[in-house]
Amino acid sequence: MSSEPAYERLGAKVLSLPDVIAQSVGFMGPIFSSAFVIPLVVGVISASGKGGGVAAPLSVIIAAIGVFALGWIVSSYAREIHSAGSLYDYVTRGLGKRTGTAAGWLYYGGIVVLAAGLLLLIGGYLQSTIQSEFKVSPLPSWAWTLIVIALIAVILYFGVRVSTRSQLALALVSIIVVTIFFVTVIVKLGSANSAKPFEPSSAADGWSGIFFGVLYGVLLFVGFETAANLAEETPNPRREIPIAVMATAGIATVIYVVATYVTVAGFHYSLKTVAAAAGAPLFALGASKSAGGYGGTWIDRLLELVVLFDMLAVAIGCCVAATRGIFAMARDRRVPASLAVTSKKHGSPLGASAFVIGICVVALLLNQFWTSLFALPQTPHYFAMFAWGSTFGGFALVVVYFLMCIGSLRSFAGAERRASIIVAAVIGLVITGGAIFGSFYKVTSPTIEAPYYAVALLVIGFASTFVLRARESASTALADLSASASR
């Protein structure tokens, strides 16, 4: 008789379709990305010096095609595997246990590092925004970060429904407000609206620039697939997870195309003007008419508030995805079993939550006491830490997307949908391969160190398979975590 302990379980299956969509949209943070990342796609802040330029919306559309291809693969796996491990289980199914374990280390390690960096940014954003708008500074940035960490710890403890409903409220408010603002800008532009942003000839560097815009544009969508981490807590994951993944890709595409168009058109199709506002183009557009914007003081303050809301949604989404994935890996003994401990009352992953919160606290201490770590010239240290962490996280996730695409060719070789999988995998490999290239091309120190550290984590994850005594994946050992249980 086997003495192997039973597989640990998460809480009840209580999530609805809006909940799992909220996880993907919340993690992705379309308003946060629209506020700060669009200039990267345009090319005015990219390491390569290239981007889509005036044709940046076209770059986003092409990137979205690649994301839909990735979404098709994720959806295909999600119909078969209903485990909280998501991409870790998908890569395991396609490329074997060792590579799957390494991918899990990289994927969830990337999300944790991204979350830690983002929490530092939220603290700095709160302190600097309150200081600039109201000329007071009630708390230093580290204190704001600590408060947000504590808030997220409470949300994680009380269960997944609290987490997803928090994301839904924060993301929905921010999307509605910013969408109304974008429509207002388009209306005010009047006859200045143009189809130029959708014409390849508008790109200063031609198709080369558009290509680089696509590479950076893919990063806008990172995290769109994380609804899959909630499969175990969803009554009908075979139906709802694929819908959530593809719906999120669609929602994001519309928001990003409109946001990129408004950024380019709102600054009168001038890359110099976009570059001048590259630090926060959304807020520059929200400024008064005399300052070259389309709003005023109260509009700008409202935009600052909803961007904060979206940042909080991203932070919650990162922590929810990371805790579920780490729990799943610990349950399979791919990482220490203590990380699979759950709350008896709420069914939340206590061990994984404590680990993620602990890493965020360590990052806060590093930010405070090791001020030369990943430092950038004339840049607040919290922002430098975020820039490094987001580079690490974005690269980590894109590499795992790449591995998932390769594995899908094997996983679905005999499936009825194999033709569509082959097409999606080829498109996905091209898009993610390009994004990986963009993570290295002309990137300078210390940012260039991030992908190398990520590769090191991938190697460590692979090496761990020779040390840790893993067991059969729950996604294959437990009947309700496979397709047959929900048919």
Stretch-by-stretch model annotation:
Residues 89-91, 96, 128-132, 244-316, ...:
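TM-loop-TM module centered on a large, flexible mid-protein loop between adjacent transmembrane helices
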Residues 6-11, 53-57, 133-142, 168-304, ...:
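Helix-loop-helix junctions that connect adjacent transmembrane segments
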Residues 30-136, 141, 448-465:
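Extracellular loop-to-transmembrane helix junctions
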Residues 40-57, 129-141, 161-170, 302, ...:
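Transmembrane helix-loop boundary segments of multi-pass membrane transporters
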Residues 83, 106-123, 221, 226-233, ...:
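Membrane-helix boundary/coupling elements in multi-pass transport proteins
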Residues 29, 387-388, 392-400, 406, ...:
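A generic transmembrane alpha-helix motif of multi-pass inner-membrane proteins
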Residues 1-54, 67-68, 72, 194-198, ...:
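Membrane-interface "cap" regions at the ends of multi-pass membrane proteins
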